[in-house]
Amino acid sequence: MSGGVQEQFEIKFRLPDGTDIGPKRYPAASTVATLKESIVAQWPKDKEKGPRTVNDLKLINAGKILENNKTLSECKSPICDFSGLTTMHVVVRAPTSDKQSNKIVAKKPKDFRCGCSIM
């Protein structure tokens, strides 16, 4: 890099149904959370079950789930060097309602006890 020009990466996002958002260029200093905000804003309105917040999304690149607080530079590795166009896979977490989350908490594993009977 010379002359203060910041490195940029060209990224497209592959949605669960196989369609794409992008490609678009992002500065190397962009965080994964920033990418997710961009995805939420660009999510096609005609698609059902879209994300409401960045926490509803997971980004996967080169088989790794990317952490929200990491920058693109920090996500680079020998496997994922962001050279050329990079495709990241988007996974949308199914929204859970309060009723569903209460059911999960309410279900406790039953104690398994042995019973002996003398005949």
Curated annotation (Swiss-Prot):
Modified residues (Cysteine methyl ester): 116
Keywords: Cell membrane, Lipoprotein, Membrane, Methylation, Prenylation
Membrane listed as a keyword: yes
Domain Ubiquitin-like: 9-75
Positions of the propeptide removed during maturation: 117-119
Pfam families: Rad60-SLD_2 (PF13881)
Membrane topology: Lipid-anchor
Compartmental location: Cell membrane
Gene3D superfamilies associated with the record: Phosphatidylinositol 3-kinase Catalytic Subunit, Chain A, domain 1
Primary location group: membrane
Lipid-linked residues (S-farnesyl cysteine): 116
Classification via CDD domains: Ubl_MUBs_plant
Domain of life: Eukaryota
Cystine pairings recorded for this chain: none
GO cellular component, one term: plasma membrane
Known role: May serve as docking site to facilitate the association of other proteins to the plasma membrane.
Name of the featured protein: Membrane-anchored ubiquitin-fold protein 1
Organism: Oryza sativa subsp. japonica (Rice)
